[in-house]
From Swiss-Prot:
It comes from Mycobacterium tuberculosis (strain ATCC 25618 / H37Rv). This is Aspartate carbamoyltransferase catalytic subunit. Belongs to the aspartate/ornithine carbamoyltransferase superfamily. ATCase family. It catalyses: carbamoyl phosphate + L-aspartate = N-carbamoyl-L-aspartate + phosphate + H(+). GO terms for cellular component: cytosol; peptidoglycan-based cell wall; plasma membrane. Gene3D superfamilies: Aspartate/ornithine carbamoyltransferase.
């Protein structure tokens, strides 16, 4: 992992990823029983969130993570900043660097935006840490980390587990990051989607590809359902919403085909009735709300790793 950045799941070795997951658990434990959820870990640090796409879970969890670690958290959005007046992303980034930001957390519709931000602000390796909170259809590494943490908590481990990812793989930054991270952690990954929703070159990914959802269910340890990202489409990817749901939706019938220990995940937002029914989403096998809770502690661990370092995480978490 690049010490000052988290731009892609490929930045993470198995040791890096495991350390972040372990530290996420430590930070969560350190907060148990506190009337005021505050740790002094990042006191005096300034964290800036830069969200150029709509977000609820990711934006809020990064803000909460920073505040629970006593960082000063500042929000920048296109609507409420000079971006709305035409300022470029580069100029905004350089302005925030000059203002003394210690970390920049960016979500942007353009793939590669986080990498560019790191280049622009880190010319002399003394700029702010950059964390990718989702860039176009490219990647979303912290989502993959919180998914991995949830799987580990539910199943007791990730090594050797069979994880089935279903839906709009083509447009999903979550799928890309999860495939890389889960493979790094020793899981077997299966991608299930219609041919039209699979990216070119997917056969080169460390995953098996299937078009038959039912066939993959009996051996699945976890099923990660993905929303169809209609906002990134011009139509024509499948005949109808109803047909898509019939073939690739996680219904009660399909849930009954899963092993009893299997866990159901969804990165959100969910489109109930399309890729997942309400009864499945709200069932005991569903870990959707656990994912949200884990998002805060994972992002606490990521902020700590890029701003301070892993060596004192246990000591800081207990402070």
């Amino acid at each position: 992992m690049t010490p000052r950045h988290l731009l892609t799941a490929a930045d993470l070795s198995r040791d890096d990823a495991t350390a972040i997951l372990d530290d996420a658990d430590r930070f969560a434990q350190a907060l148990v029983g506190r009337d005021i959820k505050k740790l002094p870990t990042l006191r005096g640090r300034t964290v800036v969130t830069m969200f150029y796409e709509n977000s609820t879970r990711t934006r809020v969890s990064f803000e909460v993570a920073g505040k629970w670690m006593s960082a000063d958290v500042i929000n920048v959005s296109a609507a409420g900043s000079s971006v709305g007046k035409g300022e470029s992303l580069r100029d905004t980034a350089l302005t925030l660097r000059a203002a003394g930001a210690d970390a920049l957390i960016i979500r942007h519709p353009a793939s590669g935006a986080a990498h560019l931000l790191a280049q622009w602000t880190g010319a002399h390796n003394d700029g702010p840490a950059v964390i990718n909170a989702g860039d176009g259809t490219h990647e979303h590494p912290t989502q993959a980390l919180l998914d991995a943490l949830t799987i580990r908590q539910r199943l007791g481990g990730i090594e050797g587990r069979r994880i089935v990812i279903v839906g709009d793989i083509l447009h999903s930054r979550v799928a890309r990051s999860n495939v890389m991270l889960l493979d790094t952690l020793g899981a077997e990954v299966v991608l299930v989607a219609p041919p039209t929703l699979l990216p070119v070159g997917v056969t080169g990914w460390p995953a098996t590809v299937s078009h038959d959802f039912d066939a993959e269910l009996p051996a699945a340890d976890a099923v990660l359902m993905l929303r169809v990202q209609a906002e990134r489409m011009n139509g024509g990817f499948f005949p109808s919403v109803r047909e898509y749901s019939v073939r690739y939706g996680l219904t009660e019938r399909r849930q009954a085909m899963l092993p009893g220990h299997a866990v159901v995940l969804h990165p959100g937002p969910m489109v109930r009735g399309m890729e997942i029914t309400s009864s499945v989403a709200d069932s005991s096998q569903s870990a959707v709300l656990q994912q949200v809770s884990n998002g805060v502690q994972v992002r606490m661990a990521v902020l700590f790793h890029v701003l301070v370092g892993a060596q004192d995480a246990g000591k800081e978490g207990a402070a």
